[in-house]
Amino acid sequence: VVVIETHVEFGMKPIIVPYDPNYMYPGKHPIYHGASPAAMNILARNKGYRLVVTNDLGINHIYLRNDIALNEIPEIEVATTLTHPKTIASFKSFEEIKDWEFKEV
C-alpha cells in the first residue's frame, strides 16, 4: 500500500513542479510544489500500482500493488476522484500559476 498526497488544484493535467533543492514552503506560491493526481497515477502505474481509493477531496491517493487483491479491490479512475465541489472550486487557484514552469509526465 502506498499513500500519496497530490495537488488537486492541478486538475487532470499530468504535470509536476520541477524539483528545487532549496524549496521551503510556501515558496513562490502555496500550491507551486508537488504533482497532479494524473501525474502521480502515471508514476504509480509505471511502478506496478493501481489507484484504489482517495479521500473525499481526492487529495490523498491510496495505491495497491497490482499483484494484490486485483479481483477484490478494483482500480478506479483519477477523474472520478475530482468531483467534490471544494475540489472543483480549487481548480481556479491553478490559474494564478498556470504559466509557470511545469514538467509534463
Model region roles, listed by residue range:
Residues 1-8:
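Conserved beta-strand signature within the Rossmann-like core of class I S-adenosyl-L-methionine
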